[in-house]
Amino acid sequence: MEKDKGKYISLFYGLSFFGTVIGAIIPTVENWGVTTAGSANDATYIALFILMVMGSVVACCISDPSRVIRNDGSRVFIPRNTTFVQELKNIVLAIKREPWIILFFPYSFAGLWYIPYQSNDFNGYFFDLRTRAFGSLWFDFGQFAMAVVMGMLLDLKAIGGRRRRAFVCWGVLFTLLNAVFIGGVFPARISHRGVTPPGGLIDLTDSSRAGGYIALFVFYGCVDGAWQTFAWWIAGALSNDPLVLSIYSSFYKVFGAMGAAIVFSLDVRGVSYQGMFGSYWGLLAGSMLFVFVLIYKRVHDTSVLLTGAVALEKADEEPSNAAKGV
């Protein structure tokens, strides 16, 4: 249901990020005694592999979509299988039907840009091994917590209608993002490739430095958690049609993967840490401006009357239940 989209999106990302929290506990425990810049031991990777296998087994227990019933008694729409050619046509038709979705592409492109800077250029540069693991644990917790908080805000009726909530939460995310990156300017200025951090690697017992750097790393996680939840909620606010939403989600994933491939290439090529940081901040803040226009133009208090599946099905077929707003 429209009123619960934020809740279920945050539930999805909350569970996902909670899994990373559990996963981060393993390297933290396994490498607790390592105060050098080494790499994780074999036991860490074995434990993580076992955890992933367990997750795969649990996924087999997911209920069949035909058995899922909403709170209002209606059943979820199950789209029929289509051919690869039809899927390509659907993408073109979806953009023709909703050309404003193009404004979502920059936001999608920036969605995974954070990975090399945060993991390699900040966490990997400033901390010793056990502090990296310890910081990653709290980074993942920040992702988890902020994903849940953002989902709750997006559904909070006290703020107003859905359109108003979109603008308010956009403001929250934009403010959080820039506040965190202003704090990130200071460590970025003193980090250089091939050079040990001033004062040496930071260990979590170094009370004069560890607290501030770990806190900043946690807030980077908070930005990412809020970013991902807001992305899926905005996409969900544009339509209720699962056929259309599946295409929007593919846009987010494809452009995000494209951005990740590019930024990892930049990192491998040795772009300065300042350049990596600047591109990270600039892309995120700049793409938020495009999303603001998208909200202004296309996010309404309801999408029930908006259709999409009609354009993506054969013209002579009846509209799907999803297209009717179910």
Labelled PLM ranges:
Residues 215-254, 258-265, 271-282, 287-293:
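C-terminal transmembrane module of eukaryotic multi-pass membrane proteins
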Residues 2-40, 44-55, 107, 111, ...:
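Glycine-rich segments within core transmembrane alpha-helices of 12-TM secondary carriers
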Residues 11-17, 41-62, 107-108, 171-180, ...:
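Symmetry-related core transmembrane helices of the 12-TM Major Facilitator Superfamily/SLC fold
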Residues 31-92:
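Short, flexible helix-coil linker/hinge segments at the edges of structured domains or between repeats
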Residues 35, 40, 158-165, 240, ...:
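A helix-boundary/kink motif common to multi-pass secondary transporters
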Residues 60-75, 187-191, 293-305:
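Helix-loop junctions on the cytosolic side of multi-pass membrane transporters
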